[in-house]
Regions:
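N-terminal intrinsically disordered, acidic low-complexity segments at the extreme N-terminus
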Residues: 1-10
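N-terminal type II signal-anchor transmembrane helix
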Residues: 9-56
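A structural signal for short, hydrophobic/glycine-enriched beta-strand patches
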Residues: 12, 42-201
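Alpha-helical structural elements
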Residues: 33-35, 49, 194-195, 211-214
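Structural signature of transmembrane alpha-helix termini at the membrane-water interface
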Residues: 37-41, 80, 217-221
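A transmembrane-helix-recognition feature enriched in membrane-embedded lipid enzymes
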Residues: 202-223
């Protein structure tokens, strides 16, 4: 009787799941430490790079109208007036946002009136200024009202200047609402308090950047 000897292949050692998880965790920790060290050594480079990655901007170009949305009276009507003087647009639309209690009492100027006065002082005639919408409450309702104006008036291109950090959200919202009905351009404008290369030195810049990141995510999820 012949004895049979069974041979087996050497067992292949596989890393345990726990070991692999530990390696991934350590790699992530190492990356975070290195990134933190780099940011500590060169914080301005990192912060400036973050702004460059976030900010999107269209070049101003001839358009049927320029729209001035709610807020940002320190820079939005100024940009619109500049485009008008350069002959890029002959019509400036002003968002008709809802009046605040103080505005209803006549203590404060309405958004439409305040922007209209700024535009006229910058050389834009009253005949070139037109309000759009009614009691608009946020960027999305402004985009919808602006789209309705464009369709009603046969507009093919509209420029909507906004600040550097809000440009990404506004650009996405306009493209989402307008579709292929008209071209929307969103030039990113520096607010008077900060620019892309020094935003972290100003409280409004810090708050503005973080708020816009959250708003952008909210808009993408909601709309």
């Amino acid at each position: 009787m012949t004895a049979r000897f069974e041979t087996s292949e050497p067992a292949v050692l596989r890393p345990r799941p726990r070991s692999m998880t530990r390696r991934v965790f350590l790699a992530l920790v190492a990356c975070i430490v290195l990134l933190g060290l780099w940011a500590w050594l060169k914080p301005e480079t990192l912060l400036r790079g973050a702004a460059d990655l976030w900010i999107v901007s269209d070049e101003p170009a001839p358009a049927d109208a320029v729209a001035v949305l709610g807020g940002g009276i320190e820079y939005r009507p100024f940009a619109a007036a500049d485009y008008y003087r350069r002959g890029l647009a002959l019509k400036i639309l002003v968002s008709n946002v809802g009046a605040t209690p103080a505005e209803r009492l006549g203590v404060l100027q309405s958004h439409v009136r305040a922007n209209s006065e700024v535009l006229q002082k910058l050389g834009v005639p009253a005949s070139a200024i037109e309000p759009f919408g009614d009691r608009l409450s946020d960027t999305f309702t402004e985009a919808v009202a602006l789209h309705e104006w464009a369709v009603r008036n046969g507009a093919h291109r509209i420029m909507v200047p906004t600040d550097i950090f809000a440009a990404r959200r506004l650009s996405w919202t306009l493209h989402h609402v307008f579709g292929n009905d008209a071209v929307t351009l969103v030039p990113a404008v520096n607010p008077p308090e900060y620019q892309r290369d020094n935003w972290w030195r100003n409280e409004r810049g810090i708050i503005g950047f973080q708020n816009e990141v959250m708003k952008y995510l909210y808009y993408r999820l909601k709309y």
